[in-house]
Amino acid sequence: MTKNKVALLLGGLALLTACEQNKVTEISTEELLKNINNPTYLIVDTRHDSLYNGFKDQNATKGGHIKGAIQFTTAWLDYIADDKFESFAKDKGISKDKTIVFYDSNLDDLQRISTEFAAKGYKVKVFKDFINYANADYPLESFTNYQLSVSPQWLNAAIHGEKPETYTNDKLMVFEVSWGDLEKAKSYTQHIVGAYHFNTDWIENAPVWNLSTPKVIEQNLIKNGITKDKTIVLYSENQLAALRVLWALKWAGVEDVRFLNGGLTGWVDANLPTETQVNIPTPVASFGTTIPQYPEINLSMPDDVIKAQKENGLKLISNRSWDEYTGKISGYDYIPGKGEPDGAIWGFAGTDSSNLADYYDPDHTLRNPLEIIELWKQQGINKDDHLAFYCGTGWRASVPWFMTKMMGWKNTYVYDGGWNAWQMDSKYPVQKGAPNNMSKPDAHNDFGKIQKKGNSCKS
């Protein structure tokens, strides 16, 4: 026998031995309940965001996730670099000294993720009876306003005239959101069937890039068929655009406006149809109410922030990159000033002004709000605080604001003027550098950039 054959044989035996030592075993409902508060056990929901957040799984009478469960979606496996896998899992609380209990209603996904972790040396059990668990009188948790973030499957059902959970309307419009008129809207070249284009200029204007006047916004909305009583679903290639417009529509008075989590990529991955033809909305005569209906969610200019700080102790939360926050760069070629409003707290962000990477999962869906809340706690940002999120011009700030709305937090706002408005007048106090020379806080979200194929015992 050649040395190569011996090496291959020994390697195969080693892999078999590893898989034998890390067999995946099933856990019963009784055993799960017995260990639900056991610190040596970790329960992990591997389903898509909408199901974890609160939507009902197929054939389930209740929605949400098992009490105390964290989230690690099976689809993430395709986006986590091999050299980051264990550190990323550790950041989620998954370690080899714990018994990891995975559950999912999709047994193929459950097998994939459980064998992947077992092959890497984790102690793994699987819970295959989640639907019966959900239909029994066992504890489930969900987010207060989980319906704000919808899945491709939910939207597809609504488009086809069905009544998916929480949807009671018969008037639906879907918009791809990006800057520019149709001829400049590259993200609209391929879009969800029936979707329209929403130009972000319809709700904001230079030089501050704050919300336009109520009259201008009303004219743009009715010209594009948007009324207060229609269900509006928004998506964008860059999540910031859709969530910026969602905040603006909620400010205006649209009662049911939602975000397609995962955008067009998630839609295509779900094998749902797209088209290239241009759809033009039919104008309407009236928005249906006076704009704005919810002015309180907007702190427009620096003076509004200062007033709120004096009245209720408002905390100003920066969602600008660390280099912007510490005054190394302004972040924009049209914003000359560097620094932050005095007293601003860093609320995590992204690599530059175009993204909010700390808030995204490996598959580019929104990160679990519970993880973000834990990061905020380290920064002194808490549920009962009055919080105004801001960035340069309001786009990035819409993401954390949206998450607080999902969680049912009451006193959260977007400071629309952001750093751009603040730095325009030298009378407003500015801080530069990291407060107290603090180091950049860890977002615990480094999954690398290399796609992986998997390394499990599953054949």
Task: Specify the residue positions occupied by each region the protein language model found.
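Gram-negative bacterial Sec-dependent N-terminal signal peptides
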Residues: 1-20
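Cytosolic catalytic domains that perform sulfur/thiol-centered chemistry
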Residues: 19-459
